[in-house]
C-alpha cells in the first residue's frame, strides 16, 4: 500500500530509524489495516468509535497485553500524523486515548528507544557482547532478571532454540528464543564467554571477574548503557520485559 510505503520511507529518510524499528512500525500498521479490511472500515475515514472498537478487539478478542496495545496505538498515531501532515486532513485516530484497564500500564520502551539502546554495547569487546545478549534475552524472551542470571550453559538447546528456566516456586519451564537471539547467543559463546570464564563457572552470564552475574549486576549494566543514550527513562529489566 502506497501510504504505508511512503510512511516507512519517511521513517528511514527523515527520522533516520533503523530497518528493525521501521519493520516494527510497519507490522503494527499492517495489522491495523488488515483489521480495518476485515471489518469493512475505510482507514482514511475511520471514526472515533471505530478506532475505539479496534482497541477493544485487541484486548478482548486477541487478548493482547496492555503494553503491546499501547505501542500499537502509538505506531498507528504516528502513521496518521504523517498522513495528516501530507494530506492536510484530520483523522479520528489522533483523538484516541488508551482505555483504562484498572491497573496502571507498565512502563515500556518505544521502538526507536529500543533501537538506540541496542546500538550501545561494543561488540568488539567481551563485556559488550555479553551486554548485547542481556538486552536481547530480556527483551525477546520476557524472562525475569532472576531467571536470566540463573541460566547455565547446559540449560540451552541451540537445535530447538529453547532454554530450560527455573522460575517462581522452583517450577521448571521452557522458554523459546528466535533467530536474532540465537545469533547473539552464538556470538557470546564463541567470542566472549570463554574470555570471561576465569573461574570455570557453569552459568551463562559472567561478570568481569569471572563469577556469576547477579541481578544487581544486570541493573548496573543497564544503568551504564543508559548513560550513553538521550533517553530520559530509567531502564529496568522489568521495563525491557514489557517492551
Identify the residue ranges that each predicted region occupies.
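Conserved catalytic core of the tyrosine transesterase superfamily
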Residues: 1-243
Amino acid at each position: 500500500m502506497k501510504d504505508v510505503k511512503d510512511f516507512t520511507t519517511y521513517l528511514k529518510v527523515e527520522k533516520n530509524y533503523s530497518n528493525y524499528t521501521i519493520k516494527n512500525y510497519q507490522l503494527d500498521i499492517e495489522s491495523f489495516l488488515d483489521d480495518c479490511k476485515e471489518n469493512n472500515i475505510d482507514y482514511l475515514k475511520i471514526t472515533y468509535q471505530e478506532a475505539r472498537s479496534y482497541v477493544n478487539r485487541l484486548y478482548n478478542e486477541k487478548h493482547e497485553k496492555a503494553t503491546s496495545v499501547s505501542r500499537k496505538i502509538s505506531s498507528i498515531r504516528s502513521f496518521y500524523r504523517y498522513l495528516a501532515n501530507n494530506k492536510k486532513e484530520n483523522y479520528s485516530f489522533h483523538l484516541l486515548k488508551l482505555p483504562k484497564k484498572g491497573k496502571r500500564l507498565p512502563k515500556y520502551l518505544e521502538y526507536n528507544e529500543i533501537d538506540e539502546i541496542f546500538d550501545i554495547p561494543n561488540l568488539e569487546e567481551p563485556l559488550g557482547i555479553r551486554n548485547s545478549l542481556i538486552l536481547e534475552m530480556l527483551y525477546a524472551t520476557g524472562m525475569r532478571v532472576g531467571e536470566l542470571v540463573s541460566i547455565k550453559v547446559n540449560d540451552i538447546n541451540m537445535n530447538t532454540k529453547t532454554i530450560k528456566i527455573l522460575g517462581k516456586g522452583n517450577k521448571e519451564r521452557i522458554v523459546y528464543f528466535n533467530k536474532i537471539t540465537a545469533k547473539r547467543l552464538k556470538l557470546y559463546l564463541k567470542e566472549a564467554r570463554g574470555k570471561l570464564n576465569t573461574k570455570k563457572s557453569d552459568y551463562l552470564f559472567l561478570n568481569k571477574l569471572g563469577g556469576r552475574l547477579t541481578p544487581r549486576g544486570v541493573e548496573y549494566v543497564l544503568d551504564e548503557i543508559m548513560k550513553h543514550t538521550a533517553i530520559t527513562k530509567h531502564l529496568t529489566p522489568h521495563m525491557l520485559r514489557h517492551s
